């Protein structure tokens, strides 16, 4: 191998090794957490008791399902459900009779997370599981397409997860009450929300004439701007990821399901439109009004969708 080619190969390999994956943190708050243990054999009796129930302390091989409500993500109101299907083995290096011996403590389960925006629209799903925390994130859909990573959890000692019999009516879970806790996701995404870039900078346009925001035509406080963005997640109506958004024929635009936020120098901007860009594949339109009082100069702009922030971009402001 030519020494110059070898040098380039080694340099590129070193650069790839040096690159660290970008990790996104989601702090997910859940409430009304109830674990239903399969302590009743008769199917006719399952879910039939409208009253608060108790259950037996499980030995190994006890199956159960936990159901929780997602109420917030990163401090912002959200909706959704978290469901765990588990096999209680009670692994322990020093097991009591009826427990499973192992070199670690815990059990194992498979978790399913279904995230919704405040208005109930679908944002994304995450699948994870493991023998004990941290659980392994196995994948995702929607805004979390192909996500990997892990999660841990922080219990609330004042409101632990409630254990119930599978005979209890699950339609009354919120009325009867349950526990609450926080799950900390650390995700590596296949793609992240981003502001599209051009050779002259971010693809952010003046709404009055569709010219590019640049040093000769900077943005102004209070001005309406239009951003070209990518990776904002599912829309209504739904459009497959590899298909163009519908042509605009005067009908309402295809709207992004997740909450979309824009900040300029940390100040929130008013988002007026969050939609698929007609006839384009994977490009979204975000119309926003510049906040008042933005300091002239180069301003840091950041886009957030599905609680995932973009990298900051810089735009000139006068």
Residue ranges and their predicted role:
Residues 19-121, 127:
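Extracellular or lumenal secretory-pathway regions
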Residues 20, 36-38, 54, 58, ...:
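A sequence-level detector for low-complexity, Ser/Thr- and acidic-rich stretches
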Residues 69-70, 112-114, 134, 141, ...:
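Residue-level detector of beta-strand face positions
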Residues 103-171, 288:
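Acidic, glycine-rich flexible loop segments
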Residues 111-115, 182-185, 202-205, 259-262:
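Short polybasic amphipathic segments
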Residues 165-191, 263:
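N-terminal targeting pre-sequences for secretion and organelle import
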């Amino acid at each position: 191998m030519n020494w110059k080619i070898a040098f380039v190969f080694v340099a590129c390999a070193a650069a790839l090794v040096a690159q660290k994956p970008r990790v996104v943190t989601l702090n997910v708050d859940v409430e009304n957490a109830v674990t239903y243990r399969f302590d009743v054999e008769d199917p006719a009796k399952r879910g039939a008791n409208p009253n608060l129930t108790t259950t037996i302390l499980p030995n190994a091989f006890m199956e159960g399902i936990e159901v929780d409500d997602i109420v917030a993500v990163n401090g912002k109101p959200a909706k959704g459900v978290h469901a765990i299907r588990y096999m209680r083995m009670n692994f322990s290096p020093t097991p009591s009779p009826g427990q499973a011996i192992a070199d670690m403590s815990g059990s194992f389960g498979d978790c399913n997370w279904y995230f919704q925006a405040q208005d109930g629209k679908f944002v994304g799903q995450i699948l994870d599981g493991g023998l004990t925390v941290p659980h392994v994130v196995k994948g995702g859909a929607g805004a979390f397409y192909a996500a990997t990573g892990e999660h841990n959890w922080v219990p609330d000692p004042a409101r632990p997860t409630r254990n119930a019999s599978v005979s209890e009516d699950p339609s009354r879970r919120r009325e009867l009450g349950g526990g609450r806790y926080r799950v900390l996701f650390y995700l590596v995404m296949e793609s992240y929300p981003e502001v599209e870039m051009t050779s002259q900078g971010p693809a952010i346009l003046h709404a009055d004439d569709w010219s590019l925001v640049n040093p000769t035509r900077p943005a102004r406080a209070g001005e309406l701007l239009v951003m070209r963005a990518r990776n904002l997640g599912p829309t209504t109506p739904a459009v497959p990821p590899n298909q163009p958004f519908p042509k605009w024929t005067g009908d309402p635009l295809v709207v992004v399901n997740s909450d979309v936020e824009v900040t300029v120098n940390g100040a929130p901007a008013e988002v007026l439109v969050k939609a698929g860009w007609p006839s384009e594949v994977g490009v979204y339109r975000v119309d926003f009004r510049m906040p008042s009082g933005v300091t002239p100069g180069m301003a840091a702009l950041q886009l957030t969708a599905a609680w995932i922030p973009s990298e900051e971009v810089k735009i000139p402001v006068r």
